[in-house]
Amino acid sequence: MITRMSSLFLHTLRDDPADAELASHKLLVRAGYIRRVAPGVYSWLPMGLRVLRKVENVVRREMDAIGGQELMFPALLPKEPYEVTRRWDEYGPELFRLKDRKEADYLLGPTHEELFTWLVKGELNSYKDFPKVLYQIQTKYRDEARPRAGILRGREFVMKDSYSFNMTDEGLDESYRLHRKAYQRIFDALGIEYVICYATSGAMGGSASEEFLAVAADGEDTFVRSTESDYAANVEAVVSIPPAEESVEDKPEAVSHESPGADTIETLVEWANEAGLTVDGAPVTAKDTLKCIVCKVTRPGEDEDGNPYAPELTGVLVPGDREVDMKRLEASLEPAVVELADDEDFKKYPFLVKGFVGPRTFADNDLRMLADPRVVKGTAWITGADEKDRHYSNLVAGRDFTPDGYVEAAEVREGDPSPDGKGVLTLSRGIEIGHIFQLGRKYTEAFDVQILDENGRRTVPTMGSYGIGVSRLLAVVAEQMHDEKGLRWPRSIAPYDVHVVIANKDEAAGEAARELAEALSDAGLEVLFDDRPKVSPGVKFKDSELLGMPQVVVVGRGFAEGKVELRDRLNDERSEIDYADAVDVITKAARA
């Protein structure tokens, strides 16, 4: 097929959009692939839609290959299934909620575990119906607080979500393995550089969870890799290695000191050394201090009176040389919402002395206290004494204070020991493109799905959930593969196989270009033909670089000698070939 640019609905832009920061966002808008409608909401124009459909087909091919069956649920969903799993509340403000004219509650689907489980409950009843893999490719909705980066982080996006249903845990393991391999084939086909990482399950629940992260310097996710093993994890899933517990019997008693003005870790360390305090004979460092962070943790849902749960003050203890990573803390406490206490909270609760909060105040006031795994029994700390200008030294965990639990809240650093005991961690940035979960029986039990097994006994099947951000994949390819001139699409998803450009006003050259485009189309290639009569060769060349087809053939000055120029956009190489050989050369390259 041939698409003529003289009639194509396409308008390229010279300047970057004002709200764009990432290269993929800038180029997809400038090249006329997408257009912004509202914050986080974009229209797909003809060129962009062609790429999106091709990405969908790559995903669909691999899902079908592992026995997946495609269906389609509505995007507008009733409240009731999401109440069964409590996710109507747990999703929090990201869930688009609405009412119809009869005041019935609905939502715009962010993901469809409930609907798939509901469907299986109503349609299947025998072990002979299993295993099953069902999937859809559909638009999803999430009310992002800060939509950004174009289609990478929007409020409306296209996603493939699939669900496996098995009678046994061993069957779930196999379905999970098949999806993992299928995802690798999908991302390999698109030429994406990615890493498979351990991940948290979040509001999805379940046990095993892995993310596929595309490597990107400007990605919003941080992940780690070990220098001496295959270990890789999203930073939110990294488990700290605690030191060995120590006896509290031989520890010196805690001492309260005057510490005027020592209301930060930096000034606390400075004061401690000036006061002559030491740790095992060495000067005090930030690592010897204990930072006590005050948070407000709000559970989703309502209390017995039907009121939203009130925020609960919670103490979070981390070594003083570490900053609190709010993403790690939030992931540890999901689905609760976590906020740092503000000045109003310190005024409201006088037992919280800003800059001098210590662990004892949480126990004395019946507040929950969570600690970093490094705050183990027998470790001694310099920390706040809950009075202005006073600190404790030798405050010992397990003797002077005891955490109610442990939480991963401290930042992960380059050089930290790898959780698998092999090497140290390096940090990189990435963009999540896929996530796979072993959900187990969380949803099937919630919906009371009962299937008769081979012995006639009722059994609850087990589930897996597997997501790919389809529209996000398009942006990731643009982010990883662009150059300073524009987009560079891999052959698997390029809008067209070849871009034919007339760069010669000679009528014979123009006719030859038209014949070449038709011959390439007859050979089975998808051809973009720049036949715009009043556009200069320079503008045509710039547009060809911006649009990013893998091959560009220019019928220009060399045509008088029977030559055309072939440009390989992926490798940025140019060569002259005989016009008579052009169809064979281009077709062979397109099918390589």
From Swiss-Prot:
Catalytic activity: tRNA(Pro) + L-proline + ATP = L-prolyl-tRNA(Pro) + AMP + diphosphate
A biological process term (GO) from this entry: prolyl-tRNA aminoacylation
InterPro entries, per database record: aa-tRNA-synt_IIb, aa-tRNA-synth_II, aa-tRNA-synth_II/BPL/LPL, Anticodon-bd, Anticodon-bd_dom_sf, Pro-tRNA-ligase_IIa, Pro-tRNA-synth_IIa_bac-type, Pro-tRNA-Synthase_IIa_type1
Keyword Iron-sulfur listed: no
Pfam families (alphabetical): HGTP_anticodon, tRNA-synt_2b, tRNA_edit
Main location: cytoplasm
EC number annotated for this UniProt entry: 6.1.1.15
Molecular function in Gene Ontology: aminoacyl-tRNA deacylase activity; ATP binding; proline-tRNA ligase activity
Subcellular location: Cytoplasm
Signal sequence range: none
Gene Ontology terms: cellular component: cytosol
SUPFAM superfamilies: Class II aaRS ABD-related, Class II aaRS and biotin synthetases, YbaK/ProRS associated domain
Keywords: Aminoacyl-tRNA synthetase, ATP-binding, Cytoplasm, Ligase, Nucleotide-binding, Protein biosynthesis
Statement: the UniProt record of this protein carries the keyword Transferase: no
Record text on subunit structure and interactions: Homodimer.
Domain statement: Consists of three domains: the N-terminal catalytic domain, the editing domain and the C-terminal anticodon-binding domain.
Similarity comment: family membership: Belongs to the class-II aminoacyl-tRNA synthetase family. ProS type 1 subfamily.
Listed NCBIfam families: PRK09194.1, proS_fam_II
Described purpose of this protein according to its UniProt entry: Catalyzes the attachment of proline to tRNA(Pro) in a two-step reaction: proline is first activated by ATP to form Pro-AMP and then transferred to the acceptor end of tRNA(Pro). As ProRS can inadvertently accommodate and process non-cognate amino acids such as alanine and cysteine, to avoid such errors it has two additional distinct editing activities against alanine. One activity is designated as 'pretransfer' editing and involves the tRNA(Pro)-independent hydrolysis of activated Ala-AMP.
Protein name (database record): Proline--tRNA ligase
Organism: Corynebacterium urealyticum (strain ATCC 43042 / DSM 7109)
